[in-house]
Amino acid sequence: MKPRIGIPTDELIEINPIMPNNHPAYAPHDVKEAFIKLGAIPLIIAFPDDVSKVDQLAQDYVQLIDGLMLPGGPDVDPTFYGEEPHPKIGMTLYQKDRFESALIKAALAADKPIFGICRGIQIMNVAMGGTLYQDLESQYPELKIQHPQATLGQFATHHVELTAGSKLAKLYGRSTIKVNSRHHQAVKAVGKGLKVTAVAPDGVVEGMESTDTDLFLGVQWHPENMWQQEDPQQLVVFQDFLDRIAAHRK
């Protein structure tokens, strides 16, 4: 059977005078296309409004999937790492954060691999007890490059250093790569069971992996926006996710 990839949704929160309660749920198009190209089945999974149903629903979803993919999206609510909201924090969705945290814990308990992109690496870090810079420009003194780049997502804008011997370095086959950049938040204190394996020139965390297992790999950039045109090699992180799933299904 083809691997089934669970992808949590975002919701489009806008006032619609015709259908005021119609909040379309969606997942990133290029993420879906990457998995289809590689022979996997993307399953879009939506979060409930009622947070009392989150834990059971997360357990039910994890039984249906072979791996959990955490895509980009809105900022993570700082409530989940014990902070007040910074003046420059963007939109947050409490139910989404609560749901994805439950999905992460359920997936790890079921020995099912996780792959995170952008917000995905951030919510994984928070779920494991880590913290975030709520706004790099305001809170990160060593900032030297623009991380929320104002350009098309398929184009690389800055370099990333990959840790020698890390999964990321092995996948890309070199110690430095060039990536796109579409974020204003980043990993601060690293969560339990995680390690940093990629950094930007100014030290901002760009990649993380599990310390003792192969269950998690995450990147801060958006490989899904680059593989179709500018950098086909960016598919390697998607293929690695499927390879990890295959290993855990045996």
Question: Where do the language-model regions lie?
Answer:
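Post-Walker A helix-loop "phosphate-sensing" segment adjacent to the P-loop in P-loop NTPases
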Residues: 129-133
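Conserved G/P- and acidic residue-centered "switch" motifs that form tight phosphate/ATP-binding loops
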Residues: 118
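Active-site-proximal beta-strand elements of phosphoester/diester hydrolases
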Residues: 217-220
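N-terminal beta1-alpha1 cap of cysteine-dependent amidohydrolase-like domains
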Residues: 1-115, 126, 137-171, 176-178, ...
